[in-house]
Amino acid sequence: MTGYIHSKESFGTVDGPGIRYVLFMQGCPMRCLYCHNPDTWKMNGGEAVKSEDIIEEYWNNRHFYHDGGITVTGGEPLLQIDFLIELFRAAKEKGIHTCIDTSGITYAEKDVAYRKRLDLLMTYTDLVMLDIKHIDPDCHRRLTSRSNERPLAFAKYLEEKNVPLWIRHVVVDGYDKEEHLYALGEFIGRLSNLRALDVLPYHTMGVTKYKELNIPYPLEGVSATSRERAQEAKNIILRGIYSVRKAKK
C-alpha cells in the first residue's frame, strides 16, 4: 500500500524508546501556533512510499535499531490509517516495535467503520505518544484552531484498549497557567496506561520555514520557553498526577 510522507529520519532519538526509524506523514488538519513543520499541512502533497519498502529498509539496518523501532509522526499520521495498518502489521510480523505520535484529532468515537480500523491498528501498536496541546477547551482552540474533545476522548479510548501511553505537552509562555497544568496532571493521572510524560519547551526553530513558505508566523514576538520553565511546568503536572493517584489509594 502507498502512503505519503513529508520526510523520514533514520536516527530518531526523541520519538519513542531507543533509536527510531521515523516517518513524518504528510497532511494535518490542525494549525498549531507553534507548529515547526507547516510544510506537512497540505493533504495532497508528500512523497509516495510503499509499506514494504519501508520495512525492507528498516530490516536491512535492524541491528542499528536493536533497542528501538518504527515511529510514525506528522503531520497527523492517523489521517493515513489504512497505510499504518499495513505497515504496522508487517512490522509486527518481524518483531519490530511500533509507535504512533499523534494529536488524536482524527478520533471519531461514533464512526463505527473508523473504530473498527482503529481497533485493528491498535492490535499492531506497541506505544502511542499523544500530544495533548492544552487541557482547557478555549485555550486549545486558540492554540490549534480545533476543540480538544477528540484528543481527550482518544486518550480514554487508549486506556480502554490498554495501549501503553506516552503523553507530550509543549509549554508556551502566556498559554500555560498553573491551574491548567495541574488540571492536565489530574486528567492524565486517571489514565492507568500512562507510561511516560514529556513536557517540552516551545522553540522558534520553525520560523525560517514560515518565511520560506510566505506564511505569517503566528507566535511572532513570543520568546522560546526555557528548559527551567518547562521543568517547572512538568513539576506542576506531576503534582496533579500524584494528587489523583494518592486519592485512589
Model-identified regions with their sequence ranges:
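Canonical Radical SAM [4Fe-4S] cluster-binding loop centered on the CxxxCxxC motif
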Residues: 1, 7-49
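Auxiliary Fe-S-binding modules of radical SAM enzymes
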Residues: 2-14, 171-249
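Conserved alpha-helical substructure of the radical SAM core
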Residues: 38-70
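Short glycine-enriched, charge-decorated loop/helix-capping segments at active-site entrances
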Residues: 38-43, 141-147, 214-223
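Conserved AdoMet/S-adenosylmethionine-binding subsite of the radical SAM
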Residues: 59-69, 78-205, 212
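Short acidic donor-binding/metal-coordinating loop in glycosyltransferase active sites
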Residues: 74-75
